[in-house]
């Protein structure tokens, strides 16, 4: 079942490329598989199979998750005419963004910032429909994102990693609400399973005592 939208923003190898024939591009890997990520209150890993069958039909490329502005690029069904190309590999999801630096001032500024090293991070917004947890009762549980149902957008971000300013921290907290809800659900399921196990053990013990009592009565009647 799909849950709320989540975002992750970290430092990745973002590169600016220029080709006289084909224009200016930004390439990077916003989603990395099997990499342990410290989210502050838990450790998260994205499974190598997390993007199998994921909805990548309409993914936009933004700056700082600004959905009010004009997207700098877009992938529609990941066809060859899209201005953003997505490629799922054994290591994660790579992107190649074709920037219109001639007609779009934001695209030109972003390209310059990436080339200079001023902008070094990418973030992606996604929806998880399957995850699992380990060490759920500890202060630092471990989450595995088993499957992502949809990737909504990818953004270039200025503050990709911890520590962040209070504004980014607040934003990150909101983005992780879905993950926290998933953890609470896992903890509740564990508690319910333990309660059921305890009840089953109690009933089994009671039945065993009853059987022993019946056997004693039978023995006395013989």
Regions found by a protein language model. Name each.
Residues 1-184:
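Signature of dsDNA virion morphogenesis modules
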Residues 171-222:
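Charged/polar low-complexity intrinsically disordered segments, enriched in acidic residues
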